[in-house]
UniProtKB/Swiss-Prot annotation:
GO molecular function per UniProt: iron ion binding; S-ribosylhomocysteine lyase activity
Xref: Pfam families: LuxS
Protein name: S-ribosylhomocysteine lyase
Co-factor requirement: Fe cation
Classification lineage: Bacteria, Pseudomonadati, Pseudomonadota, Gammaproteobacteria, Alteromonadales
Alphabetized SUPFAM superfamilies for the sequence: LuxS/MPP-like metallohydrolase
Organism, scientific name: Shewanella oneidensis (strain ATCC 700550 / JCM 31522 / CIP 106686 / LMG 19005 / NCIMB 14063 / MR-1)
Domain of life: Bacteria
Length: 169
């Protein structure tokens, strides 16, 4: 099985909250695709609550589009990581890490403005696979933590696992 890009970086050295360019690709038609690692908490040290990350999934996707989409950027998808330490965001375009960090912080401010659970988009049995597994309070706690900490940048060159370490794993 091929070694995926996300497993060539040292998770013990990742800062959080932080943005990292996980991958750049160019489609056969010449479109630039960028995948970002939006690391909410430090791997193996903290984890996002199940209900909080699920509610963020519903809110974050729309708010990030509000703040980042434009003439040269269009978000394709934002999905939570299975390890529950962050989200992956795939988009058309090549925004800077700072642009992404600023949009992320603005999105967290938007999460804090949601007043009631009923305002969470697609919160019903027809559009959500576990529509009862949500917590606006937990999502807002996560948002407050991100705003308080600020968002830094993780660089692949700083996190790259050596061939020696990879060979032992």
């Amino acid at each position: 099985m091929p070694l995926l890009d996300s497993f060539t970086v040292d998770h013990t050295r990742m800062n959080a909250p932080a943005v990292r360019v996980a991958k750049h690709m160019t489609t056969p038609k010449g479109d630039a695709i960028t995948v970002f690692d939006l690391r909410f908490c430090a791997p193996n040290k903290d984890i996002l609550s199940e209900r909080g990350i699920h509610t963020l999934e519903h809110l974050f996707a729309g708010f990030m589009r509000d703040h980042l989409n434009g003439d040269d950027v269009e978000i394709i998808d934002i999905s939570p990581m299975g390890c529950r330490t962050g989200f992956y965001m795939s988009l058309i375009g090549v925004p800077t890490e700072r642009q992404v960090a600023d949009a992320w912080l603005a999105s967290m401010e938007d999460v804090l403005k949601v007043v009631e659970q009923s305002e969470i988009p697609e919160l019903n049995e027809y559009q959500c696979g576990t529509y009862e597994m949500h917590s606006l309070e937990q999502a807002q706690d996560i948002a407050r933590n991100i705003i308080a900490a600020g968002v830094s940048v993780n660089r692949n060159d700083d996190l790259k696992l050596s061939d020696e370490i990879l060979g032992k794993l």
